[in-house]
């Protein structure tokens, strides 16, 4: 998916506003995903997925850190996410549909925390960005 100059600006602006809340938002998005799409819990059977779990907090931070890295390297998502793509494709074997579920939950979380900034243009830019990240993460599944 091609990100326009406006999309890239929106992505950078959004990630700038997230600041130190990335881990918190990542955890919240994961909890939303577990509640809305309970089958996603099967990929996390080795950890405690209950609300407030230290393990979900830690994974939420990993998600947020990976997305921050992607936002910082939006011109080269495949290069920035290559290791993570290998991990999800070859070791974790996460069903690609789960990236869509998490992307949706991330959008909801960001909209809840930044309603004034979550314009239709911002929504569209973030949706395209998350779809691009998902595409990169699933590119090595073939």
From Swiss-Prot:
GO biological process assignments: carbon dioxide transport; cellular oxidant detoxification; erythrocyte development; hydrogen peroxide catabolic process; in utero embryonic development; negative regulation of blood pressure; nitric oxide transport; oxygen transport
Tissue distribution: Red blood cells.
UniProt modified residues of type N6-succinyllysine: 8, 12, 17, 41
Chain sites annotated for binding heme b: 88
GO molecular function, one term: iron ion binding
A UniProt-annotated Pfam family: Globin
All copies of domain Globin, residue ranges: 2-142
Residue numbers carrying N6-acetyllysine: 17
Positions bound to O2: 59
PROSITE patterns named among the record's database cross-references: GLOBIN
Sequence positions bearing Phosphotyrosine: 25
Organism domain of life: Eukaryota
Record's keyword annotation contains Iron: yes
Matches recorded under Gene3D superfamilies: Globins
Extent of the signal sequence: none
InterPro entries linked: Globin, Globin-like_sf, Globin/Proto, Hemoglobin_a-typ, Hemoglobin_oxygen_transport, Hemoglobin_pi
Residues that bear Phosphothreonine: 9, 109, 135, 138
Entry's Gene Ontology cellular component terms: haptoglobin-hemoglobin complex; hemoglobin complex
UniProt keyword terms in alphabetical order: Acetylation, Heme, Iron, Metal-binding, Oxygen transport, Phosphoprotein, Transport
Modified residues (Phosphoserine): 4, 50, 103, 125, 132, 139
Miscellaneous information on this protein: In rats there are two non-allelic alpha chains and two non-allelic beta chains. The alpha-1 chain sequence is shown.
Known role: Involved in oxygen transport from the lung to the various peripheral tissues.
Family: Belongs to the globin family.
Subunit and interaction comment: Heterotetramer of two alpha chains and two beta chains.
Name the record gives this protein: Hemoglobin subunit alpha-1/2
Lineage summary: Eukaryota, Metazoa, Chordata, Craniata, Vertebrata
Gene: Hba1
């Amino acid at each position: 998916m091609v990100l326009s100059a406006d999309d890239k600006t929106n992505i950078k602006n959004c990630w700038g506003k997230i600041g130190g809340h990335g881990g918190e938002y990542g955890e919240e998005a994961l909890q939303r995903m577990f509640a809305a799409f309970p089958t996603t819990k099967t990929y996390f059977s080795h950890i405690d997925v209950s609300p407030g779990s230290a393990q979900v907090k830690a994974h939420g931070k990993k998600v947020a850190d990976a997305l921050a890295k992607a936002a910082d390297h939006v011109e080269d998502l495949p290069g920035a996410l290559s290791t993570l793509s290998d991990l999800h494709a070859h070791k974790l074997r996460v069903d690609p549909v789960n990236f869509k579920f998490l992307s949706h939950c991330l959008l909801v979380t960001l909209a809840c925390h930044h309603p004034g900034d979550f314009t239709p243009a911002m929504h569209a830019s973030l949706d395209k960005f998350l779809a691009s990240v998902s595409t990169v993460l699933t590119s090595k599944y073939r």
